[in-house]
Amino acid sequence: MASRLVRRCTCLLREAARLAPAMSPVGQPRLTRGAPRTLTSSATSPSSHLPGSLSELVERGQVFTPYPERQEVDHLIERATQPEEILALLGGGHCLHQNRAALMVIQLSRLLSEKPKDKALLIKDARFQHLLRLVNSQINAVWHGTLVKLLRSLYALGLPATSKELQSVEQEVRWRMRRLRYKHLAFLAESSATYMQEQGSQELLAELLVHLERRWTEIDDGRTVVAMMVKIGHLSQSLMNRLEDKCLELVEQFGPEELRKVLVMLAAQNRRSVPLLRAVSYHLVQKPFTLTKSILLDLAYAYGKLGFHQTQVFQRLAADLLPHTPSLTSSEVARCTKSFAFLKWLSLPLFEAFAQHVLDRAQSIALPHLCNMLLAFARVNFRPEREDQFFSLVHEKLGSQLAGLEPALQVDVVWSLCVLQQAREAELQAVLRPELHGQFLGDKSPKDQSTFQKLLHINATAQLEHPEYTGPHLPSSALVPRPSALDKKVTPLQKELQETLKGLLGSADKGSFLVATRYGWILDAEVLLDADSQLLPLRDFVAPHLAQPSGSQPLPAGAKRLAFLCWEFPNFNSRSKDLLGRFVLARRHLLAAGFLLVDVPYYEWLELKSEWQKSAYLKDKMRKAAAEELAK
Protein backbone atom coordinates (compact mmCIF):
# COMPACT_ATOMS: atom_id res chain seq x y z
CA MET A 1 0.00 0.00 0.00
CA ALA A 2 2.81 2.39 0.87
CA SER A 3 4.57 1.83 -2.43
CA ARG A 4 1.36 2.39 -4.39
CA LEU A 5 0.77 5.64 -2.48
CA VAL A 6 4.31 6.87 -3.22
CA ARG A 7 3.94 6.07 -6.94
CA ARG A 8 0.61 7.91 -7.10
CA CYS A 9 1.99 11.00 -5.31
CA THR A 10 4.99 11.01 -7.67
CA CYS A 11 2.63 10.98 -10.63
CA LEU A 12 0.64 13.87 -9.26
CA LEU A 13 3.75 15.92 -8.52
CA ARG A 14 5.08 15.33 -12.04
CA GLU A 15 1.77 16.53 -13.49
CA ALA A 16 1.76 19.59 -11.24
CA ALA A 17 5.30 20.46 -12.35
CA ARG A 18 4.20 20.26 -15.99
CA LEU A 19 1.40 22.77 -15.28
CA ALA A 20 3.67 25.16 -13.36
CA PRO A 21 4.45 27.52 -16.29
CA ALA A 22 0.77 28.38 -16.54
CA MET A 23 0.76 29.76 -13.06
CA SER A 24 1.67 33.24 -11.82
CA PRO A 25 5.31 34.07 -11.23
CA VAL A 26 4.34 34.85 -7.69
CA GLY A 27 3.70 31.19 -7.19
CA GLN A 28 0.85 31.67 -4.74
CA PRO A 29 -2.13 29.51 -5.81
CA ARG A 30 -5.59 30.68 -4.84
CA LEU A 31 -8.63 28.52 -4.26
CA THR A 32 -11.53 29.24 -6.56
CA ARG A 33 -14.92 30.44 -5.41
CA GLY A 34 -16.42 27.08 -6.30
CA ALA A 35 -16.51 24.12 -3.94
CA PRO A 36 -13.01 22.66 -3.50
CA ARG A 37 -12.29 19.36 -5.19
CA THR A 38 -10.25 16.87 -3.22
CA LEU A 39 -7.70 14.54 -4.77
CA THR A 40 -8.16 11.11 -3.26
CA SER A 41 -6.72 7.65 -3.66
CA SER A 42 -9.66 5.30 -4.10
CA ALA A 43 -9.75 1.79 -5.45
CA THR A 44 -13.20 2.47 -6.79
CA SER A 45 -11.89 5.26 -9.01
CA PRO A 46 -10.18 3.63 -11.98
CA SER A 47 -9.55 6.97 -13.62
CA SER A 48 -7.21 7.82 -10.79
CA HIS A 49 -4.73 5.27 -12.14
CA LEU A 50 -4.43 7.06 -15.47
CA PRO A 51 -1.46 9.38 -15.85
CA GLY A 52 -3.65 12.08 -17.36
CA SER A 53 -6.21 12.11 -14.57
CA LEU A 54 -4.95 15.39 -13.07
CA SER A 55 -5.08 17.23 -16.40
CA GLU A 56 -8.62 15.99 -16.97
CA LEU A 57 -9.57 17.20 -13.52
CA VAL A 58 -8.04 20.62 -14.23
CA GLU A 59 -9.92 20.84 -17.52
CA ARG A 60 -13.26 20.04 -15.88
CA GLY A 61 -12.77 22.60 -13.04
CA GLN A 62 -9.45 23.96 -11.96
CA VAL A 63 -8.46 23.31 -8.40
CA PHE A 64 -6.24 26.41 -8.29
CA THR A 65 -6.78 29.74 -9.99
CA PRO A 66 -3.45 31.48 -10.49
CA TYR A 67 -3.02 35.23 -10.13
CA PRO A 68 -3.08 36.68 -13.67
CA GLU A 69 0.16 38.08 -14.94
CA ARG A 70 0.41 41.86 -14.55
CA GLN A 71 -0.16 43.72 -17.79
CA GLU A 72 0.13 47.30 -18.97
CA VAL A 73 -3.46 48.07 -18.02
CA ASP A 74 -2.67 47.31 -14.35
CA HIS A 75 0.07 49.92 -14.37
CA LEU A 76 -2.23 52.42 -16.09
CA ILE A 77 -4.86 51.96 -13.38
CA GLU A 78 -2.34 52.40 -10.57
CA ARG A 79 -0.65 55.46 -12.09
CA ALA A 80 -3.82 57.33 -13.07
CA THR A 81 -4.04 60.81 -11.59
CA GLN A 82 -7.34 61.90 -13.16
CA PRO A 83 -10.71 60.10 -13.32
CA GLU A 84 -10.72 60.61 -17.08
CA GLU A 85 -7.63 58.40 -17.41
CA ILE A 86 -9.50 55.55 -15.71
CA LEU A 87 -12.68 55.95 -17.75
CA ALA A 88 -10.68 56.08 -20.99
CA LEU A 89 -9.52 52.50 -20.38
CA LEU A 90 -13.06 51.23 -20.99
CA GLY A 91 -12.84 51.98 -24.69
CA GLY A 92 -9.18 51.18 -25.19
CA GLY A 93 -9.54 47.51 -26.05
CA HIS A 94 -7.95 46.41 -22.78
CA CYS A 95 -8.78 43.07 -21.20
CA LEU A 96 -10.66 43.99 -18.02
CA HIS A 97 -10.94 40.76 -16.08
CA GLN A 98 -13.03 40.43 -12.93
CA ASN A 99 -10.54 42.20 -10.66
CA ARG A 100 -9.45 45.05 -12.93
CA ALA A 101 -12.93 46.53 -13.24
CA ALA A 102 -13.26 46.58 -9.45
CA LEU A 103 -9.78 48.11 -9.10
CA MET A 104 -10.81 50.88 -11.50
CA VAL A 105 -13.76 51.77 -9.25
CA ILE A 106 -11.47 51.75 -6.21
CA GLN A 107 -8.98 54.06 -7.94
CA LEU A 108 -11.77 56.44 -8.97
CA SER A 109 -12.86 56.63 -5.34
CA ARG A 110 -9.33 57.51 -4.25
CA LEU A 111 -8.94 60.22 -6.85
CA LEU A 112 -12.26 61.84 -5.89
CA SER A 113 -11.97 61.36 -2.13
CA GLU A 114 -12.08 65.12 -1.46
CA LYS A 115 -14.12 66.27 -4.47
CA PRO A 116 -17.83 65.83 -3.68
CA LYS A 117 -18.98 67.79 -6.73
CA ASP A 118 -16.96 65.60 -9.07
CA LYS A 119 -18.42 62.49 -7.42
CA ALA A 120 -21.93 63.58 -8.34
CA LEU A 121 -20.87 64.14 -11.96
CA LEU A 122 -19.10 60.78 -12.09
CA ILE A 123 -22.18 58.85 -10.95
CA LYS A 124 -24.14 60.32 -13.87
CA ASP A 125 -21.40 59.51 -16.41
CA ALA A 126 -22.49 56.76 -18.83
CA ARG A 127 -19.00 55.25 -18.87
CA PHE A 128 -19.04 54.91 -15.08
CA GLN A 129 -22.45 53.23 -15.25
CA HIS A 130 -21.04 50.81 -17.82
CA LEU A 131 -18.11 50.12 -15.47
CA LEU A 132 -20.52 49.37 -12.62
CA ARG A 133 -22.45 46.93 -14.81
CA LEU A 134 -19.19 45.25 -15.77
CA VAL A 135 -18.25 44.84 -12.11
CA ASN A 136 -21.71 43.54 -11.29
CA SER A 137 -21.54 40.90 -14.02
CA GLN A 138 -18.25 39.57 -12.61
CA ILE A 139 -18.87 40.14 -8.89
CA ASN A 140 -18.69 36.48 -7.90
CA ALA A 141 -15.09 36.27 -9.16
CA VAL A 142 -13.72 39.40 -7.45
CA TRP A 143 -11.07 38.56 -4.88
CA HIS A 144 -11.85 38.94 -1.18
CA GLY A 145 -9.55 41.86 -0.45
CA THR A 146 -10.67 43.72 -3.54
CA LEU A 147 -14.33 43.06 -2.71
CA VAL A 148 -14.25 44.79 0.67
CA LYS A 149 -12.34 47.74 -0.82
CA LEU A 150 -14.89 47.89 -3.63
CA LEU A 151 -17.77 48.16 -1.18
CA ARG A 152 -15.97 50.88 0.75
CA SER A 153 -15.35 52.76 -2.51
CA LEU A 154 -18.99 52.56 -3.60
CA TYR A 155 -20.03 54.00 -0.23
CA ALA A 156 -17.42 56.75 -0.51
CA LEU A 157 -18.54 57.68 -4.04
CA GLY A 158 -22.04 58.23 -2.71
CA LEU A 159 -24.03 55.66 -4.66
CA PRO A 160 -27.66 55.72 -3.55
CA ALA A 161 -28.87 52.90 -1.32
CA THR A 162 -31.26 51.82 -4.10
CA SER A 163 -28.41 51.24 -6.57
CA LYS A 164 -28.60 47.74 -8.01
CA GLU A 165 -24.80 47.48 -8.20
CA LEU A 166 -24.33 48.57 -4.58
CA GLN A 167 -26.92 46.09 -3.36
CA SER A 168 -25.23 43.36 -5.40
CA VAL A 169 -21.84 44.04 -3.79
CA GLU A 170 -23.42 44.16 -0.32
CA GLN A 171 -25.11 40.82 -0.94
CA GLU A 172 -21.86 39.28 -2.17
CA VAL A 173 -20.11 40.44 0.99
CA ARG A 174 -22.82 38.85 3.10
CA TRP A 175 -22.49 35.55 1.21
CA ARG A 176 -18.74 35.49 1.72
CA MET A 177 -18.75 36.73 5.32
CA ARG A 178 -17.72 33.41 6.82
CA ARG A 179 -14.84 32.97 4.37
CA LEU A 180 -13.40 36.47 4.67
CA ARG A 181 -10.28 36.77 6.75
CA TYR A 182 -10.60 38.71 9.98
CA LYS A 183 -8.43 41.52 8.64
CA HIS A 184 -10.95 41.97 5.79
CA LEU A 185 -13.84 42.13 8.25
CA ALA A 186 -11.93 44.60 10.40
CA PHE A 187 -11.08 46.78 7.40
CA LEU A 188 -14.70 46.79 6.29
CA ALA A 189 -15.90 47.72 9.77
CA GLU A 190 -13.32 50.47 10.26
CA SER A 191 -13.84 52.06 6.86
CA SER A 192 -17.51 51.50 6.14
CA ALA A 193 -19.48 51.31 9.42
CA THR A 194 -20.41 54.99 9.24
CA TYR A 195 -21.50 54.67 5.60
CA MET A 196 -23.59 51.60 6.44
CA GLN A 197 -25.44 53.54 9.11
CA GLU A 198 -26.05 56.44 6.74
CA GLN A 199 -27.03 54.22 3.79
CA GLY A 200 -29.48 52.21 5.86
CA SER A 201 -27.50 48.97 5.48
CA GLN A 202 -28.32 47.98 9.04
CA GLU A 203 -28.63 44.26 8.32
CA LEU A 204 -25.17 44.07 6.78
CA LEU A 205 -23.70 46.09 9.66
CA ALA A 206 -25.39 43.90 12.26
CA GLU A 207 -24.13 40.73 10.57
CA LEU A 208 -20.64 42.19 10.34
CA LEU A 209 -20.60 43.04 14.05
CA VAL A 210 -21.77 39.52 14.92
CA HIS A 211 -18.95 37.94 12.90
CA LEU A 212 -16.39 40.28 14.42
CA GLU A 213 -17.56 39.35 17.90
CA ARG A 214 -17.60 35.60 17.24
CA ARG A 215 -14.12 35.60 15.75
CA TRP A 216 -12.48 38.08 18.12
CA THR A 217 -9.80 35.56 19.10
CA GLU A 218 -8.35 35.83 15.57
CA ILE A 219 -7.07 39.35 16.29
CA ASP A 220 -3.31 39.11 16.56
CA ASP A 221 -2.04 42.70 16.41
CA GLY A 222 -2.52 45.79 18.51
CA ARG A 223 -3.25 48.13 15.61
CA THR A 224 -6.37 46.18 14.64
CA VAL A 225 -7.84 45.99 18.12
CA VAL A 226 -7.19 49.68 18.82
CA ALA A 227 -8.66 50.78 15.49
CA MET A 228 -11.78 48.67 16.02
CA MET A 229 -12.28 49.98 19.54
CA VAL A 230 -12.06 53.53 18.24
CA LYS A 231 -14.19 53.11 15.10
CA ILE A 232 -16.89 50.56 15.95
CA GLY A 233 -16.62 49.67 19.63
CA HIS A 234 -19.49 51.99 20.50
CA LEU A 235 -21.84 50.15 18.12
CA SER A 236 -21.93 46.90 20.11
CA GLN A 237 -21.55 46.53 23.86
CA SER A 238 -20.73 42.81 23.64
CA LEU A 239 -18.14 43.39 20.89
CA MET A 240 -16.56 46.15 22.94
CA ASN A 241 -16.24 43.79 25.90
CA ARG A 242 -14.41 41.29 23.66
CA LEU A 243 -12.16 44.00 22.27
CA GLU A 244 -11.27 45.13 25.79
CA ASP A 245 -10.31 41.54 26.65
CA LYS A 246 -8.10 41.36 23.57
CA CYS A 247 -6.65 44.77 24.37
CA LEU A 248 -5.68 43.54 27.83
CA GLU A 249 -4.01 40.56 26.18
CA LEU A 250 -2.00 42.68 23.73
CA VAL A 251 -1.41 45.86 25.75
CA GLU A 252 2.18 44.85 26.45
CA GLN A 253 2.90 45.31 22.73
CA PHE A 254 1.45 48.83 22.59
CA GLY A 255 3.53 51.92 22.05
CA PRO A 256 2.65 55.37 23.41
CA GLU A 257 0.47 56.19 20.39
CA GLU A 258 -1.69 53.08 20.86
CA LEU A 259 -1.99 53.73 24.60
CA ARG A 260 -3.05 57.30 23.84
CA LYS A 261 -5.72 56.12 21.39
CA VAL A 262 -7.12 53.60 23.87
CA LEU A 263 -7.40 56.19 26.65
CA VAL A 264 -8.91 58.88 24.44
CA MET A 265 -11.42 56.35 23.08
CA LEU A 266 -12.46 55.35 26.62
CA ALA A 267 -12.81 59.02 27.54
CA ALA A 268 -14.85 59.83 24.43
CA GLN A 269 -17.25 56.97 25.20
CA ASN A 270 -17.14 57.74 28.95
CA ARG A 271 -16.27 54.07 29.43
CA ARG A 272 -14.45 53.59 32.74
CA SER A 273 -12.94 50.15 32.23
CA VAL A 274 -10.90 49.82 35.42
CA PRO A 275 -8.86 46.70 34.45
CA LEU A 276 -7.86 48.27 31.14
CA LEU A 277 -7.07 51.63 32.75
CA ARG A 278 -4.89 49.89 35.32
CA ALA A 279 -3.03 47.96 32.61
CA VAL A 280 -2.43 51.08 30.52
CA SER A 281 -1.31 53.00 33.61
CA TYR A 282 1.12 50.24 34.53
CA HIS A 283 2.83 50.33 31.14
CA LEU A 284 2.94 54.13 31.11
CA VAL A 285 4.80 54.04 34.42
CA GLN A 286 7.06 51.04 33.82
CA LYS A 287 8.18 51.57 30.23
CA PRO A 288 10.61 54.35 29.29
CA PHE A 289 8.36 55.81 26.62
CA THR A 290 9.18 59.19 25.15
CA LEU A 291 5.87 61.02 25.47
CA THR A 292 5.37 63.94 23.11
CA LYS A 293 3.53 67.10 24.08
CA SER A 294 0.33 66.10 22.27
CA ILE A 295 0.33 62.65 23.90
CA LEU A 296 0.82 64.17 27.35
CA LEU A 297 -2.10 66.55 26.83
CA ASP A 298 -4.37 63.75 25.60
CA LEU A 299 -3.43 61.50 28.52
CA ALA A 300 -4.17 64.27 31.01
CA TYR A 301 -7.53 64.90 29.32
CA ALA A 302 -8.47 61.20 29.31
CA TYR A 303 -7.61 60.60 32.95
CA GLY A 304 -9.42 63.79 33.94
CA LYS A 305 -12.53 62.93 31.94
CA LEU A 306 -12.70 59.41 33.38
CA GLY A 307 -11.78 60.50 36.91
CA PHE A 308 -9.28 57.66 37.20
CA HIS A 309 -6.61 58.29 39.84
CA GLN A 310 -3.14 56.84 39.47
CA THR A 311 -0.52 58.73 41.44
CA GLN A 312 2.58 57.57 39.57
CA VAL A 313 1.02 58.42 36.20
CA PHE A 314 0.08 61.92 37.40
CA GLN A 315 3.58 62.47 38.74
CA ARG A 316 5.05 61.51 35.39
CA LEU A 317 2.58 63.64 33.42
CA ALA A 318 3.29 66.68 35.59
CA ALA A 319 7.06 66.19 35.41
CA ASP A 320 7.07 65.61 31.63
CA LEU A 321 4.73 68.53 30.92
CA LEU A 322 6.70 71.08 32.90
CA PRO A 323 9.49 71.54 30.29
CA HIS A 324 6.85 71.94 27.56
CA THR A 325 4.93 74.81 29.19
CA PRO A 326 6.78 77.61 27.33
CA SER A 327 5.74 76.08 23.99
CA LEU A 328 2.10 75.44 24.92
CA THR A 329 -0.66 77.60 23.52
CA SER A 330 -3.14 79.32 25.83
CA SER A 331 -5.78 76.82 24.77
CA GLU A 332 -3.53 73.88 25.66
CA VAL A 333 -2.62 75.40 29.02
CA ALA A 334 -6.29 75.97 29.88
CA ARG A 335 -7.17 72.44 28.79
CA CYS A 336 -4.34 70.91 30.80
CA THR A 337 -5.12 72.95 33.91
CA LYS A 338 -8.73 71.86 33.71
CA SER A 339 -7.73 68.19 33.38
CA PHE A 340 -5.50 68.26 36.46
CA ALA A 341 -8.20 70.10 38.40
CA PHE A 342 -10.72 67.37 37.55
CA LEU A 343 -8.20 64.89 38.92
CA LYS A 344 -7.76 67.07 42.05
CA TRP A 345 -4.03 66.83 41.45
CA LEU A 346 -2.22 69.98 42.55
CA SER A 347 1.35 70.01 41.27
CA LEU A 348 2.67 73.33 42.56
CA PRO A 349 5.57 73.71 40.05
CA LEU A 350 3.26 72.93 37.12
CA PHE A 351 0.46 75.24 38.28
CA GLU A 352 2.96 78.02 38.93
CA ALA A 353 4.22 77.55 35.36
CA PHE A 354 0.63 77.78 34.09
CA ALA A 355 0.08 81.02 36.02
CA GLN A 356 3.34 82.43 34.65
CA HIS A 357 2.20 81.48 31.15
CA VAL A 358 -0.89 83.66 31.64
CA LEU A 359 1.18 86.61 32.86
CA ASP A 360 3.60 86.28 29.94
CA ARG A 361 0.69 86.42 27.48
CA ALA A 362 -1.42 88.95 29.35
CA GLN A 363 -2.40 90.89 26.24
CA SER A 364 -3.19 87.96 23.97
CA ILE A 365 -4.86 85.40 26.23
CA ALA A 366 -8.55 84.95 25.45
CA LEU A 367 -11.12 85.41 28.22
CA PRO A 368 -12.63 81.88 27.87
CA HIS A 369 -9.18 80.35 28.47
CA LEU A 370 -8.61 82.62 31.45
CA CYS A 371 -12.02 81.66 32.87
CA ASN A 372 -11.25 77.95 32.56
CA MET A 373 -7.98 78.42 34.41
CA LEU A 374 -9.68 80.47 37.11
CA LEU A 375 -12.26 77.72 37.67
CA ALA A 376 -9.49 75.12 37.83
CA PHE A 377 -7.48 77.14 40.35
CA ALA A 378 -10.57 77.56 42.53
CA ARG A 379 -11.32 73.83 42.47
CA VAL A 380 -7.94 72.90 43.96
CA ASN A 381 -7.68 76.16 45.97
CA PHE A 382 -4.48 77.28 44.24
CA ARG A 383 -3.24 80.84 44.59
CA PRO A 384 -0.12 81.73 42.57
CA GLU A 385 2.94 83.26 44.19
CA ARG A 386 2.44 86.36 42.05
CA GLU A 387 -1.25 86.47 42.91
CA ASP A 388 -1.49 90.27 42.92
CA GLN A 389 -0.37 90.48 39.30
CA PHE A 390 -2.39 87.45 38.29
CA PHE A 391 -5.68 88.63 39.78
CA SER A 392 -5.12 92.21 38.61
CA LEU A 393 -5.04 90.77 35.10
CA VAL A 394 -8.18 88.74 35.80
CA HIS A 395 -10.10 91.79 37.06
CA GLU A 396 -8.87 93.86 34.13
CA LYS A 397 -10.14 91.27 31.63
CA LEU A 398 -13.44 90.80 33.44
CA GLY A 399 -14.12 94.50 33.89
CA SER A 400 -15.38 95.04 30.37
CA GLN A 401 -16.26 91.49 29.31
CA LEU A 402 -17.94 89.81 32.30
CA ALA A 403 -21.44 90.88 31.25
CA GLY A 404 -20.88 89.36 27.80
CA LEU A 405 -20.38 85.83 29.15
CA GLU A 406 -23.12 83.23 29.45
CA PRO A 407 -25.09 83.75 32.71
CA ALA A 408 -24.00 80.39 34.15
CA LEU A 409 -20.37 81.11 33.29
CA GLN A 410 -20.63 84.54 34.95
CA VAL A 411 -21.76 82.82 38.14
CA ASP A 412 -18.95 80.23 37.89
CA VAL A 413 -16.30 82.91 37.45
CA VAL A 414 -17.46 85.10 40.34
CA TRP A 415 -17.90 82.03 42.56
CA SER A 416 -14.29 81.05 41.78
CA LEU A 417 -13.14 84.54 42.79
CA CYS A 418 -15.09 84.12 46.05
CA VAL A 419 -13.30 80.82 46.74
CA LEU A 420 -9.93 82.48 46.15
CA GLN A 421 -10.96 85.57 48.21
CA GLN A 422 -10.56 87.87 45.20
CA ALA A 423 -14.15 88.93 44.44
CA ARG A 424 -14.82 92.65 44.09
CA GLU A 425 -18.03 94.52 44.81
CA ALA A 426 -18.77 95.23 41.13
CA GLU A 427 -18.42 91.54 40.28
CA LEU A 428 -20.71 90.52 43.13
CA GLN A 429 -23.31 93.03 41.97
CA ALA A 430 -23.10 91.75 38.40
CA VAL A 431 -24.36 88.27 39.31
CA LEU A 432 -26.66 89.14 42.23
CA ARG A 433 -28.81 91.52 40.19
CA PRO A 434 -32.38 90.21 39.74
CA GLU A 435 -32.09 90.11 35.93
CA LEU A 436 -29.46 87.38 36.18
CA HIS A 437 -30.25 85.34 39.28
CA GLY A 438 -33.95 85.20 38.37
CA GLN A 439 -33.10 82.68 35.63
CA PHE A 440 -32.01 80.10 38.22
CA LEU A 441 -34.60 80.46 40.98
CA GLY A 442 -37.01 77.74 39.83
CA ASP A 443 -36.45 74.00 40.17
CA LYS A 444 -34.98 73.23 36.77
CA SER A 445 -32.18 71.04 35.50
CA PRO A 446 -29.41 69.75 37.80
CA LYS A 447 -27.05 72.21 36.13
CA ASP A 448 -29.34 75.14 36.98
CA GLN A 449 -29.65 73.90 40.55
CA SER A 450 -25.86 73.75 40.83
CA THR A 451 -25.61 77.32 39.50
CA PHE A 452 -28.21 78.51 42.02
CA GLN A 453 -26.26 76.82 44.82
CA LYS A 454 -23.23 78.87 43.79
CA LEU A 455 -25.38 82.00 43.85
CA LEU A 456 -26.20 81.23 47.49
CA HIS A 457 -22.47 81.01 48.21
CA ILE A 458 -21.83 84.30 46.40
CA ASN A 459 -24.65 85.95 48.38
CA ALA A 460 -23.12 84.60 51.61
CA THR A 461 -19.72 85.96 50.59
CA ALA A 462 -21.24 89.41 50.06
CA GLN A 463 -22.95 89.31 53.49
CA LEU A 464 -20.20 87.72 55.58
CA GLU A 465 -16.91 88.78 53.96
CA HIS A 466 -17.74 92.17 52.42
CA PRO A 467 -19.25 94.39 55.15
CA GLU A 468 -19.11 97.40 52.81
CA TYR A 469 -21.32 95.67 50.23
CA THR A 470 -24.73 97.36 49.98
CA GLY A 471 -26.58 95.21 47.49
CA PRO A 472 -28.32 93.79 45.64
CA HIS A 473 -28.85 90.47 47.46
CA LEU A 474 -30.87 87.37 46.76
CA PRO A 475 -34.48 87.66 47.95
CA SER A 476 -35.32 86.08 51.31
CA SER A 477 -37.58 83.53 49.63
CA ALA A 478 -34.61 82.21 47.65
CA LEU A 479 -32.65 81.49 50.84
CA VAL A 480 -35.15 78.90 52.07
CA PRO A 481 -33.52 75.47 51.58
CA ARG A 482 -35.12 73.37 48.90
CA PRO A 483 -36.32 69.85 49.73
CA SER A 484 -33.72 68.44 47.35
CA ALA A 485 -30.92 69.94 49.48
CA LEU A 486 -31.32 67.18 52.09
CA ASP A 487 -32.08 64.33 49.71
CA LYS A 488 -28.50 63.13 49.52
CA LYS A 489 -27.74 59.69 50.90
CA VAL A 490 -26.18 59.70 54.36
CA THR A 491 -22.61 58.41 54.26
CA PRO A 492 -21.28 55.85 56.79
CA LEU A 493 -19.16 58.59 58.38
CA GLN A 494 -22.18 60.87 58.83
CA LYS A 495 -24.26 58.02 60.22
CA GLU A 496 -21.62 57.04 62.78
CA LEU A 497 -21.13 60.68 63.79
CA GLN A 498 -24.87 61.08 64.38
CA GLU A 499 -25.10 57.91 66.46
CA THR A 500 -22.07 58.82 68.58
CA LEU A 501 -23.22 62.40 69.09
CA LYS A 502 -26.73 61.32 70.09
CA GLY A 503 -25.18 59.22 72.83
CA LEU A 504 -23.20 62.21 74.09
CA LEU A 505 -26.11 64.66 74.03
CA GLY A 506 -28.53 62.47 75.93
CA SER A 507 -31.54 64.52 74.80
CA ALA A 508 -32.90 65.03 71.30
CA ASP A 509 -33.48 68.77 71.79
CA LYS A 510 -29.80 69.39 72.58
CA GLY A 511 -28.65 68.94 68.99
CA SER A 512 -29.71 69.04 65.35
CA PHE A 513 -28.49 66.97 62.41
CA LEU A 514 -28.21 67.79 58.73
CA VAL A 515 -28.98 71.48 59.20
CA ALA A 516 -29.50 73.42 55.95
CA THR A 517 -28.32 77.02 56.39
CA ARG A 518 -29.24 80.17 54.50
CA TYR A 519 -25.67 80.30 53.17
CA GLY A 520 -26.05 77.23 50.97
CA TRP A 521 -24.08 74.91 53.29
CA ILE A 522 -25.35 71.91 55.26
CA LEU A 523 -24.08 71.22 58.77
CA ASP A 524 -23.70 67.56 59.67
CA ALA A 525 -24.61 68.45 63.25
CA GLU A 526 -25.10 71.53 65.44
CA VAL A 527 -25.01 72.02 69.21
CA LEU A 528 -25.21 75.08 71.49
CA LEU A 529 -23.00 75.54 74.57
CA ASP A 530 -23.34 78.11 77.33
CA ALA A 531 -20.44 79.97 78.93
CA ASP A 532 -19.71 76.92 81.12
CA SER A 533 -19.70 74.59 78.07
CA GLN A 534 -23.02 73.03 79.07
CA LEU A 535 -25.47 71.98 76.36
CA LEU A 536 -28.48 74.22 75.70
CA PRO A 537 -31.73 73.33 73.88
CA LEU A 538 -31.28 74.63 70.33
CA ARG A 539 -34.89 75.28 69.45
CA ASP A 540 -35.40 77.82 72.26
CA PHE A 541 -32.94 80.36 70.86
CA VAL A 542 -32.78 82.52 67.76
CA ALA A 543 -30.85 81.06 64.84
CA PRO A 544 -29.80 83.74 62.33
CA HIS A 545 -28.15 81.13 60.11
CA LEU A 546 -31.54 79.58 59.33
CA ALA A 547 -33.81 81.05 56.66
CA GLN A 548 -36.88 80.28 58.80
CA PRO A 549 -36.65 81.38 62.48
CA SER A 550 -37.02 78.57 65.03
CA GLY A 551 -36.73 80.28 68.44
CA SER A 552 -37.38 83.61 70.13
CA GLN A 553 -34.88 83.86 73.00
CA PRO A 554 -31.58 85.68 72.40
CA LEU A 555 -28.41 83.73 73.03
CA PRO A 556 -27.07 83.95 76.61
CA ALA A 557 -23.82 85.83 77.10
CA GLY A 558 -20.84 83.66 76.25
CA ALA A 559 -22.92 81.04 74.40
CA LYS A 560 -21.22 79.30 71.51
CA ARG A 561 -22.61 77.48 68.45
CA LEU A 562 -20.66 74.43 67.34
CA ALA A 563 -20.97 73.08 63.79
CA PHE A 564 -19.79 69.54 63.08
CA LEU A 565 -18.45 69.01 59.56
CA CYS A 566 -17.62 65.57 58.15
CA TRP A 567 -14.87 65.64 55.54
CA GLU A 568 -14.97 62.61 53.24
CA PHE A 569 -12.18 61.34 50.99
CA PRO A 570 -13.54 63.16 47.86
CA ASN A 571 -13.45 66.50 49.72
CA PHE A 572 -9.65 66.62 49.60
CA ASN A 573 -7.05 67.12 46.92
CA SER A 574 -5.58 63.85 45.69
CA ARG A 575 -2.94 62.42 48.05
CA SER A 576 -3.33 65.42 50.34
CA LYS A 577 -5.00 66.58 53.53
CA ASP A 578 -5.82 69.95 51.94
CA LEU A 579 -9.51 70.56 51.30
CA LEU A 580 -10.76 71.48 47.86
CA GLY A 581 -11.60 75.12 47.30
CA ARG A 582 -15.34 74.61 47.69
CA PHE A 583 -14.98 73.28 51.23
CA VAL A 584 -12.42 75.90 52.21
CA LEU A 585 -15.08 78.46 51.29
CA ALA A 586 -17.64 76.61 53.45
CA ARG A 587 -15.36 76.77 56.50
CA ARG A 588 -14.71 80.48 55.98
CA HIS A 589 -18.41 81.26 55.72
CA LEU A 590 -19.36 79.30 58.83
CA LEU A 591 -16.56 80.87 60.85
CA ALA A 592 -17.68 84.32 59.69
CA ALA A 593 -21.26 83.43 60.69
CA GLY A 594 -20.11 82.89 64.30
CA PHE A 595 -19.76 79.11 64.45
CA LEU A 596 -17.03 77.18 66.18
CA LEU A 597 -16.06 74.37 63.84
CA VAL A 598 -15.55 70.75 64.77
CA ASP A 599 -13.87 69.14 61.76
CA VAL A 600 -14.22 65.36 61.47
CA PRO A 601 -11.96 64.19 58.62
CA TYR A 602 -12.29 60.62 57.40
CA TYR A 603 -8.61 59.75 57.97
CA GLU A 604 -8.91 60.51 61.71
CA TRP A 605 -12.29 58.84 62.16
CA LEU A 606 -11.12 55.60 60.52
CA GLU A 607 -8.51 55.16 63.24
CA LEU A 608 -11.21 55.06 65.94
CA LYS A 609 -12.27 51.45 66.51
CA SER A 610 -14.58 51.54 69.54
CA GLU A 611 -17.56 53.65 70.57
CA TRP A 612 -15.61 54.87 73.58
CA GLN A 613 -12.81 56.16 71.33
CA LYS A 614 -15.30 57.94 69.08
CA SER A 615 -17.05 59.60 72.02
CA ALA A 616 -13.74 60.69 73.53
CA TYR A 617 -12.63 62.03 70.15
CA LEU A 618 -15.72 64.24 69.78
CA LYS A 619 -15.48 65.50 73.38
CA ASP A 620 -11.84 66.42 72.83
CA LYS A 621 -12.67 68.20 69.57
CA MET A 622 -15.43 70.22 71.27
CA ARG A 623 -13.14 71.22 74.15
CA LYS A 624 -10.39 72.30 71.74
CA ALA A 625 -12.81 74.41 69.68
CA ALA A 626 -14.09 76.17 72.81
CA ALA A 627 -10.56 76.68 74.17
CA GLU A 628 -9.35 78.21 70.89
CA GLU A 629 -12.24 80.66 70.99
CA LEU A 630 -11.42 81.70 74.55
CA ALA A 631 -7.76 82.14 73.64
CA LYS A 632 -8.53 84.73 70.96
From Swiss-Prot:
In Swiss-Prot or TrEMBL terms, this protein is called FAST kinase domain-containing protein 4
State the taxonomy lineage. Eukaryota, Metazoa, Chordata, Craniata, Vertebrata
PROSITE patterns hit by this protein: RAP (PS51286)
UniProt entry keywords in alphabetical sequence? Mitochondrion, Transit peptide
Span of chain positions assigned to the transit peptide in the UniProt entry: 1-112
Pfam families, alphabetized: FAST_1 (PF06743), FAST_2 (PF08368), RAP (PF08373)
Q: Where is the composition biased (Polar residues)?
A: 38-50
- Gene Ontology cellular-component annotations: mitochondrial matrix; mitochondrion; ribonucleoprotein granule
